[in-house]
C-alpha cells in the first residue's frame, strides 16, 4: 500500500511521528482484508493486535512516498503473525527500509479469544498482503 506523507503525519521536527508507522501498518492490513472481501461485521469475528515488536530504522519526511509490505509468517489456531515493513523509494527506485514490525493478531468472537475455523484460514491464506 502506497502512502504519501502529509503535514498531519509529521512532528514539530518535520519527520513522521513514530506512532504513525503503526497506523500505516494497520491501514495496509485492513486494506488487504477489505480488498479480499472480508467484512468483519458479517463474519462474527475480528482480529485484535495482541503483540507488536517494532524497529524504527530511518525517518520519512513531509512529501515522501512510502510503501507498506505485509507478509503472512504464521497462521495458528487462534492467531496469525504478520511481518510488515515500510519502505521509502528514493533516487533510481532504491528501496530504503524505514520501519519493521512483527505483529500478532488474535481472533476474537464476542469479546473472547476464538479458534480460527478452516474456512477463515483458507480465506487468510488467499489474501494478497
Kindly label every feature range from the protein language model:
Residues 1-50, 108-129:
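Hot-dog-fold acyl-thioester-processing enzymes
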Residues 56, 61-62, 73-129:
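HotDog/MaoC-like acyl-thioester-processing domains
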Residues 46, 65-66:
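Generic preference for hydrophobic/aromatic residues in regular secondary structure cores
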Amino acid at each position: 500500500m502506497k502512502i504519501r506523507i502529509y503535514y498531519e503525519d509529521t512532528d514539530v521536527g518535520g519527520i513522521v511521528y513514530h506512532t504513525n508507522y503503526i497506523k500505516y501498518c494497520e491501514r495496509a492490513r485492513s486494506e488487504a482484508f477489505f480488498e479480499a472481501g472480508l467484512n468483519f461485521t458479517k463474519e462474527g469475528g475480528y482480529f485484535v493486535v495482541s503483540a507488536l515488536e517494532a524497529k524504527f530504522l530511518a525517518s520519512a519526511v513531509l512529501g515522501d512516498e512510502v510503501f507498506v509490505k505485509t507478509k503472512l509468517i504464521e497462521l495458528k489456531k487462534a492467531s496469525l503473525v504478520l511481518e510488515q515493513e515500510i519502505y521509502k523509494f528514493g533516487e533510481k527506485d532504491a528501496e530504503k527500509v524505514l520501519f519493521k514490525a512483527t505483529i500478532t493478531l488474535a481472533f476474537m468472537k464476542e469479546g473472547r479469544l476464538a479458534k480460527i475455523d478452516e474456512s477463515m484460514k483458507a480465506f487468510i491464506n488467499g489474501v494478497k498482503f
